[in-house]
């Protein structure tokens, strides 16, 4: 980890928060990050009698990719999640049991199941601006992914008095709040939920995601 870059980042962050008079207003400081999940997962550890050779554990052979986008503030409040599924048309979303996802979940699609500029801009308008409250200014900390730095998104942030700050490259894993405090517990909860199902597919995934989402967000 580059200590100089880390030091510079925290100086910049403090300056931005101080300039906007929100240094001690954690509800106005947000962090967005994404993680990926496939229907092929690692089973949780199974306790068995010593010497047992074949210990059953539920896994899925499918590997469909879903990108999960989360946003939380420094006070511990969360926004509705965004799920990006793999597909070329809206029909790819309809194949999921979307009603079983957490309340308010936003669904979108992309050929590889990844974030892109248009999805990020839609998320900013339809989730972030509607759920961040009316206080201004605010700060949104991102991981530096190109979709979070599009010109259209930055301009929209300026219009809405939302400062968008990127984490330094190559060391986001060390500094990313969601990586450090949410996605780790989420992964464990997700694998635990999956282990109780015989198969993980487009119909069962939203239920499994909801179980892990609420468990990790309230831990």
Report the location of each language-model feature.
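Phosphate-facing sequence motifs and polybasic nucleic-acid/acidic-lipid-binding regions
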Residues: 1-219
